[in-house]
């Protein structure tokens, strides 16, 4: 919305004198900063009202896993879920205000984010109303996610300003790319769905998921800005994607809304993100990575999410094949709880790992 102030200064009589001031809205960096502040302020202001309403409507709050750490049955009992509504509302408001409304990449990523958020919301609704840890059918959920992801990948190949590359770029190697052709649709959908569920699995402790999401969003804000700038993209020898820089504004909105949410999700949490938030944020990260052609880099920057997902896959596979469990409990953050680590120790150490992985992922931009 603010982006249109540039045109108004040129067309509306009397606003010409403000053109030098309004010209700052041309700059993605300025609007990204504005998106961060707006997203944070929105959640700060409306967060308490949302929490009170969710607590009133949910009653007993999110059901706690009976097979999890016994301390959770006491410390987390009665805490409302669906906190992702706070993040998504702040994200959407901030993006609408600060992003270029004519940019197709912004709308494609927003569609994935809200689509995954809607799936997560329904899952949370079933859990709260039935007071069970299981939501609706896993197969149904995966199918819906896959359909949304496939539609988004197809839209990327058709709605971009220039022909969208279907090549898979290999980090650390100069001019090395694998053209996937139509297989790009399946690969891109796998990245988006995988990211959504990986973040979902990570969201098991107070503050554990939101900070790594913010770190990843900040990292991809930088990547999107560079990929959308022809000069920087040429210098770094990464794919130039016209218009992709606008995704930095969306990443800024996520960072701001995440900061606001962390205020209420910090231990002991007043609200949980729920599938509403974790699925949406993961899907958003996946779709941005696909849009800016840094899918493999997402696996590095979001390595913590990959670790959490792999721990579950390995645990399930091991138990089915051998009848034995490799970890005391999966996802892996619960394994460390069973080893005696306190919740703050796990959360802060995982944050540190996320920062290190983000730095490693960003280093791939230059090391080619």
From Swiss-Prot:
Q: What are the annotated GO cellular component locations?
A: plasma membrane
InterPro entries, per the entry: Glycosyl_transferase_4, PNAcMuramoyl-5peptid_Trfase, PNAcMuramoyl-5peptid_Trfase_CS
Keywords of the record: Cell cycle, Cell division, Cell inner membrane, Cell membrane, Cell shape, Cell wall biogenesis/degradation, Magnesium, Membrane, Metal-binding, Peptidoglycan synthesis, Transferase, Transmembrane, Transmembrane helix
Among the GO molecular function terms of this UniProt record, one is: metal ion binding
What this protein catalyses is: UDP-N-acetyl-alpha-D-muramoyl-L-alanyl-gamma-D-glutamyl-meso-2,6-diaminopimeloyl-D-alanyl-D-alanine + di-trans,octa-cis-undecaprenyl phosphate = di-trans,octa-cis-undecaprenyl diphospho-N-acetyl-alpha-D-muramoyl-L-alanyl-D-glutamyl-meso-2,6-diaminopimeloyl-D-alanyl-D-alanine + UMP
Q: What are the names of the required cofactors?
A: Mg(2+)
The topology of this chain with respect to the membrane is: Multi-pass membrane protein
The GO annotation for biological process reads:
cell division; cell wall organization; peptidoglycan biosynthetic process; regulation of cell shape
The record's listing under PROSITE patterns reads: MRAY_1, MRAY_2
EC number(s) of the enzyme?
Answer: 2.7.8.13
Q: Which pathway does this polypeptide act in?
A: Cell wall biogenesis; peptidoglycan biosynthesis
Which family does the record claim for this protein? Answer: Belongs to the glycosyltransferase 4 family. MraY subfamily.
Describe its function.
Answer: Catalyzes the initial step of the lipid cycle reactions in the biosynthesis of the cell wall peptidoglycan: transfers peptidoglycan precursor phospho-MurNAc-pentapeptide from UDP-MurNAc-pentapeptide onto the lipid carrier undecaprenyl phosphate, yielding undecaprenyl-pyrophosphoryl-MurNAc-pentapeptide, known as lipid I.
This protein's name: Phospho-N-acetylmuramoyl-pentapeptide-transferase
* Species annotation: Nitrobacter winogradskyi (strain ATCC 25391 / DSM 10237 / CIP 104748 / NCIMB 11846 / Nb-255)
């Amino acid at each position: 919305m603010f982006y249109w102030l540039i045109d108004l200064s040129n067309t509306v009589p009397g606003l010409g004198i403000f053109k030098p001031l309004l010209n700052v809205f041309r700059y993605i960096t300025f609007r990204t900063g504005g998106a961060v502040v707006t997203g944070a302020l929105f959640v700060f202001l409306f967060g308490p009202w949302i929490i009170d309403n969710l607590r009133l409507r949910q009653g007993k709050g999110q059901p706690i896993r009976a097979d999890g750490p016994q301390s959770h049955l006491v410390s987390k009992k009665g805490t409302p879920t669906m906190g992702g509504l706070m993040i998504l509302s702040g994200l959407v408001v901030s993006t609408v205000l600060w992003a270029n409304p004519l940019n197709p990449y912004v709308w494609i990523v927003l569609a994935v984010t809200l689509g995954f958020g809607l799936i997560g919301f329904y899952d949370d609704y079933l859990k709260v109303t039935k007071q069970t840890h299981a939501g609706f059918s896993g197969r149904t959920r995966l199918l819906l996610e896959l359909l949304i992801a496939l539609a988004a990948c197809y839209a990327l190949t058709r709605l971009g300003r220039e022909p969208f590359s279907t090549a898979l770029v290999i980090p650390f190697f100069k001019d090395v790319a694998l053209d996937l052709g139509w297989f790009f649709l399946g690969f891109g959908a796998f990245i988006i769905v995988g990211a959504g569920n990986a973040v979902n699995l990570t969201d098991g402790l107070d503050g554990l998921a939101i900070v790594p999401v913010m770190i990843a969003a900040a990292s991809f804000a930088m990547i999107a800005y560079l990929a959308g700038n022809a000069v920087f993209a040429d210098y770094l020898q990464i794919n130039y994607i016209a218009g992709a820089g606008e995704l930095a504004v969306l990443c800024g909105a996520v960072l701001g809304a995440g900061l606001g949410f962390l205020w209420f999700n910090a231990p002991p949490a007043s609200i949980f993100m729920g599938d509403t938030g974790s699925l949406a944020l993961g899907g958003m990260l996946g779709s941005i990575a696909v849009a800016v052609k840094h899918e493999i880099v997402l696996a590095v920057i979001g390595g913590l999410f990959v670790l959490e997902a792999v721990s579950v896959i390995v645990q399930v596979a091991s138990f089915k094949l051998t009848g034995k469990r490799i970890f005391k409990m999966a996802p892996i953050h619960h394994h460390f709880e069973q080893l005696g680590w306190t919740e703050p120790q796990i959360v802060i150490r995982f944050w540190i790992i996320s920062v290190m992985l983000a730095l490693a992922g960003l280093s791939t931009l230059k090391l080619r």
